[in-house]
Amino acid sequence: AQGVAFKDEIMGRLIRFVSAHEVGHTIGLPHNMGSSFAYPVDSLRSASFTQKYGTAPSIMDYARFNYIAQPGDEGVALMPNIGPYDKHAVRWGYRPILEANTPDDEKPILDAWILKHQNDPMYRFGKQQFGVIDPSSQTEDLGDNAIKASKYGIANLKRIVPNLIEWTAEDGKTYEDLEILYGQVLSQFNRYMGHVSSNIGGVYEYYKTYDQEGAVYTHVDREYQKACLKFIQEELFKTPYWLIDTNLSNKIEFDGTVDRIRVNQARTLNNILDFGRMGRMIENEALHGNKAYSLTQMMTDLRRGIWSELYSQENIDPYRRNLQRAYLDRLEYLMTESQEPVSPLMRRYSNQTRVQVSQSDIRAVVRAQLRNLKQTIS
């Protein structure tokens, strides 16, 4: 769909999967944001796999578009279908159990249906989160590796940006469509940053009952967390010049390019330097020692990346200077502010690690980073 208007065939398929999703809600199915984590990333480039399984095992996930597919991946499905999880959930909820005379008689049979698929990721349920703690249960993400999936997604965005003017061109029209689509590219890029950064200090949640083995909550692997921060440093904190196209920006605005990059960088930076995330990293180290990606190590890696010019002696461009100021602003915030309370309305739905900041290690770690930075600068 290299343009603003979709063909009727594509629009029909879009309506079909959105309608199926909403019908799922009407029969009692909640969002299943953990569904898409079941598929290996590269399987979503396979025509045979995606034609059979779609983009996720459940239509109730937000796995709307296959951003992993690359040019040349012929026949790859780009949209979700009703999947094995959906059929299983509907069967569990609605299939008559004729041999049961009472609800208590039904329970062991229903439990057996669940246990039959307990080790199959296609049948996993992951709740919708307002404040991501479990990075495997996010909206709009695909596949089992956020770094790999996001690299494919960014590769596609890099192909889109140089063509936006041509794809939106129409004699007699303004550049409004160009502005809208460029904004959508930025939004999608920001989603990828969120998908990856949520792994830092992340904790997986896999529902279990007493008769199932293993932990319900597991911290994200140390090396993967480190890799996620490295990805953010390389793809976002190093100025993403591919998003800066003067031939495009001079058609949609008189200013805004520099600040737009600042906003996107600061948003992800603040997401990483979140009180709750930092609190989980402290707890992970307390529980697992050297196996954890400690808050001190993460903060050191972050500082060295954002202030890399102090070591390389490279020039600091305006975008990087803005990022460095945002870093200082955020550290000031961490030293002087406390965690914002959750409103009573959102308390039921919000995932948030509560931290008593003044009595935690957070400010001690931040203070040490500021001292190290001061020494490096001087």
Q: Across the structure, where does each feature detected by a protein language model lie?
A:
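Active-site and adjacent substrate-binding regions of carbohydrate-active enzymes
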Residues: 11, 30, 38-39
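Active-site recognition of the HExxH zinc-binding catalytic motif
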Residues: 17-32
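Short pre-active-site segment immediately N-terminal to the catalytic Zn-binding motif
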Residues: 2-19
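Conserved catalytic/binding loops enriched for acidic/polar residues
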Residues: 5, 36-378
